[in-house]
Amino acid sequence: MLRQILSEMFIDPDLLAELSEEQKQILFYKMREEQIRRWKEREAAMERKESLPVKSRPKKENGKSVHWKLGADKQVWVWVMGEHHLDKPYDVLCDEILAEREHLRAAKDAELRKAQSLQFTNSLKVKSLNCDLQAVKKTEPQNVTRKAAAEEATDQGPRAIPTKKDDKAQTKDLTKKKDSEELKQTEDEKTKQIYKNWKEDSEWQASLRKSKAADEKRRSLAKQAREDYKRLSQRGRSGDGLQNPLTGPQKPKRPPLPPKPQFLQPLGSPPKSLGNQGVIRTKTSSTQEDIIRWFKEEQLPFRAGYQKNSDTIAPWFHGILTLKKANELLSTGMPGSFLIRVSEKIKGYALSYLSEEGCKHFLIDASANSYSFLGVDQLQHATLADLVEYHKEEPITSLGKELLLFPCGQQDKPPDYLELFQ
């Protein structure tokens, strides 16, 4: 299953929805590893095709190239924002970005108002010149009379009279200075008000909180997935039913086919033979038929669905169930209840688990003649029963602490796995 996903680099959205957050993180990590591996293969093939090593390639004139910075481990140097003690917190960065945006917006508004003010001042100057010309024309006769009177009074000595031009220039400078101060004060007040509105906006605050919570959750899940991956990598083969990942899964010798299974009856109902009972089957799609054929041909020889030391079907085993049906079966149980069902989407299994928060679903990879949770292929089990026994004491994930405590059995008859064993 994992091999198929990595070869196609695609996972069905419905199948992805069944994965837990931890399995999603591990799957994305695996897919990224596969992308890097393919990229390296293509680069090596291209270098061989060009038959020139990378270092000895002739450089073009004025050619540009990119060189990645390498860390102490000789790998590409990566800086994860927010994890270094010198990095600014997320909310501080948001505040600085918003303040910078509002400052730029206020500067643009100030330039626009300055241009409008300059245009208005120019229009006032034109009007003032027109008024002055009209006043000069009207006062020309009076100036002639005043000039004659001034010539007669030359004997009395010169007299300093303030001109109207000096008063006008002084008044104009004061007005311009006052307008400039008012404009600057208005810009500062507007910038502060816009920034205050942004800070007090409830929708923005809610969006910021959600973004921070999502970042924290992703960081926590990624960290937890890495810890689980490392923890399971260090275990190796440490008990019955486990396989060493370094040497690869050893293909077991197929045992003889088990006898006809002893079907478990629903709780509270008397034993009833199913030998002569007619079973009403619904029409199945080609995908479901392929899954049934796969189970009979490839899984029955490995005693899939059987209890570990008997020929009885395990109480936690179910047939092809939908996600909705699995949730309904678990809804009547208590936290720690679980069941393993044949997936309706792929050739594999899904473990449905009831926790305090609700139902969780983990895909089980059965593609390598062994059983392991999707992505965590370092710890593989020879049978489904071994996987269940192991996780009765060892949690599936360190974060969720999922222990398989109470198997969820059949609630209807005939059992939902009947078509798999016929």
Curated annotation (Swiss-Prot):
Please give the SMART domains that the UniProt record associates with this protein: SH2
Q: Name one Pfam family in it.
A: SH2
Q: Gene3D superfamilies of this UniProt entry?
A: SH2 domain (3.30.505.10)
UniProt entry tagged with the keyword Transcription: no
Modification sites for Phosphoserine: 117, 123, 233
Q: Which UniProt keywords apply?
A: Cytoplasm, Phosphoprotein, SH2 domain
List the biased-composition ranges (Basic and acidic residues).
163-190, 212-231
The record places domain SH2 at 316-408
Per its UniProt record, what PROSITE patterns does this chain match? SH2
Annotated region Disordered: where?
141-190, 202-282
Query: Which CDD domains does the entry mention?
Result: SH2_SH2D4A (cd10350)
What is any one of the record's Gene Ontology cellular component terms? Answer: cytosol
> Could you tell me where this protein is found in the cell?
Cytoplasm
A GO molecular-function term, please? Answer: phosphatase binding
Q: What is its biological role? A: Inhibits estrogen-induced cell proliferation by competing with PLCG for binding to ESR1, blocking the effect of estrogen on PLCG and repressing estrogen-induced proliferation. May play a role in T-cell development and function.
Assembly and partners are described as: Interacts with ESR1.
Name by which UniProt lists this protein: SH2 domain-containing protein 4A
